[in-house]
Structures are given as structure tokens and as C-alpha cells.
Amino acid sequence: MAKPNILLIVIDSLRFDKCHGPKKSSFTPTIDSLIKNGIYFEQTISSAASTILAVGSLLTGLYPFRNGLGGTGYQKLNPKITNLAKILNANGYTTYATAPEIANDFGLTCDFQNPDSSYDNYFSLFSGLGDEILTKFKNEHFQSPWFFYIHLFDLHSPVILPSSFNDAKFGISQYERMVSAIDDWLSKLLKFIDQKNTIIILTSDHGEYIPVLNTANGLINLESSSTEKNLWKIGNKIPKNLLPIKKKIALTIRSSRKKLKSSKINSENLSVYEKRVLFDSRMFTGHRMYDDLLRIPLILSGPEIPQNKIITNMVRQVDILPTILSLLSISPPPDIDGQNLLPMMNKKYDEELISYIESPPSVENESMKYIGIRTSKYKFIQNIKGKKFYELYDLEKDPLEEKNIFDENANQVKIAEKLLDEIRNKKPLQKNIEFEKNEKQ
């Protein structure tokens, strides 16, 4: 039997609840069809709310602190680390990538075989990129078996929406209307794909705060203005060697945006979660480790994959690489953090996975670094340097992460710290120690 082709689609900043489920208002028949003809993991956790760290985990099966990308500042992927492109190159696959240039800058696409693997960060599907990709699939005869990684930046803030989708029927926000627009483009792409012989993986790198809320007093929408979008474009054109200037522009945008938001609404009657969504920024504010930023979609569709199945168990971004390799009967590297999800896909699976999470480097304070763990029931966060800082959330009782309960759960904090130590130092996890035990001291 011929080896299947592999199409990996990463939609930057796509949240799990805006891909499938009752909280979405976008129109997504293509994504819906992929789910109907495959598997949807509805509780997939990203390693970090940053493109570089997250895609690094996806392509290596390793947490950021183990593949060279983790740290208090952005660093390149360790070139000695085995990654998905290297493995598939060695197993007879032709590997292609179309990803924003930021991925290439940090070594994420260096091992793909096509020389045109990167594009300008602000070249969008609807300004020519989409047609370029479709032309490749229409006219080029990719050498089979092939692996193609496509990373779409159109949902990344600020969203610049094509006018043809700026209509309420495509979603209540610019963000969701863009999801509809991307879905429409995906339908065109899939016409060129032999889905009977192609494994399709659709996922995201991280989530996003969407500053749009339905309240008793009406809709609050604080999405990016056209002025802010133009400032981002200017900042993007500044050379990398002028980083301090780029950072100054970023902080100026944040400051002006915060003032504008504060002037528009009265925050006194907003909940902790509502204030976070409206006023915080994934790229600037706090530790950036809440679920809006870390829960991502994961869809697998294609040969040998069960159909119309939704898996509620928590899985991790690092599990994607070993799962792809297992579908191809290729042994994954022995020392990775991820685990093969095929057993979970094919039968009931009761083992609880633990996800390691970490904060991206901070624009304002590069020494600020947080790490944590997440299970299906709890999330624990702590800082690495300085005075100890803890957050603990009961995700079953408090899914919006509004009440920090670490004060009354000292024993759980100790268990969580032990688990973090075991993960970061690659020790065997103590199976007899359950993070979920609610024992108070």
C-alpha cells in the first residue's frame, strides 16, 4: 500500500471554541466536514501562547525548554534536535512548507526541502498568498509521498478582514468572520487533495483573547482599529536589527489601546474573566497561561482514522508528532515528551495526561517567566525567578479561571511543584501521586 501524503494546516490563533461547539458564530462547512470524516480532540493544550514556542513543540514533540526555544528571551530551535521534517525526509517523504517568515527566522522550517518555505508575516490569504498556494497544488506535481505544512497568519491580531466576509452572517466579530473566510479558502484547497490517500491535520499554535462580549447592555466590541492595524504593519517593516524601535512601537500600541478601551466601557460591573478578555493582550499582559490562549483545536482526518468521533480527554500539542509518525508506522524518537494518541483514538482511554505549559518571553520584562501544569481538572502556575507566585484553578468548578485557590490547597501546590520538577528534569512521573487529590493541610 502506498504511503499516505500528509497535509498539516496550522491556523494561527484559532481557539478551540471558535472551531467547533455552541460558542462559535462563524460559518465553517469545510471544518465541519473534516470533523465529520475524522476525529476532533476538543481539549488540546498548547505548550505556550507563542507561535515560536508552540510550533516548535508541534514539530519536535518536545516542550520548549527541551528543544532550545524556551527561556526568558526568544531563541532559535536547536539544530541538533530531531524534528518532523527531518524524520520524514529520512523516510522517503518530500517535505514542503509555506509559513510566515518568523518561523524560518527561528529555525522551524529550515529542514523542509522547498526553497520558498516562508512568506512575509503580513502577506495574507486574501492579498495573494491564498492564490499562490492554490496554484502550487493545481500546477505542481508534488513527489509522493509528500508532507506539506501550511501555516496561516490571517487570524493573528490584528485581523484584516476581506470585505466580502464583513457580514454578520459570517460571525459576530471580525475574528469569527475571518474564521469563516479561512474556511471558505480551505474548501478550495481541499479540491486539489486526494483525501482517500492524505492524512489531514488541522490545528493551531495557540488561542487568543477575543475582546467581544455580549452583555445585558448590548454587544461590547473592542477589536483592533484600522489605525492600530496600520501601526502593526509599520512595525513589521522595521529591520530586525532595530529591535528596540520595534519594541517601542509595540508598547505604544498597547498603551494607546488600553486607554481607548478604558474610555469606552465602565469596567466596574465586569467579572474577572470579562476584564481579562477585554483589557489583556496575548502578546503583552501577565503570564498569558489562561485557557483562552492555550486550548486549541486538533482535527485528524484521512485513511485509517475513525470518523465522526469527538474525544473529550485532554491531549497535548506535543502528542501530534508521535501520532502522525504512528499513523505512518514510523517509530518516534525515544526521548520526546509527546505520546501516541492512536490508542485513545481507537478505544476508551482512561489514563490522565499531564500537560506542561510555560509563558512566552515578555516584551516588557524579559526576566519574567512562568511555568505550570494542566490536567483536565486543575491548572497550576508558578514563576521561576523572584518572590514565589502561585495560581491554582479548579477547572471543573471554575472553567473561566477567576478564583485562585492556592491558599486553601497547600498540599496540591506541593504535588504540583513535584510534578513540575519531574517534567523539567525528565524524571519518571510518580503514578501514585495524583494532582487531583483534594487534601488540605
Q: Which residues are covered by each model-predicted region?
A:
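Catalytic domains that recognize anionic headgroups
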Residues: 1-441
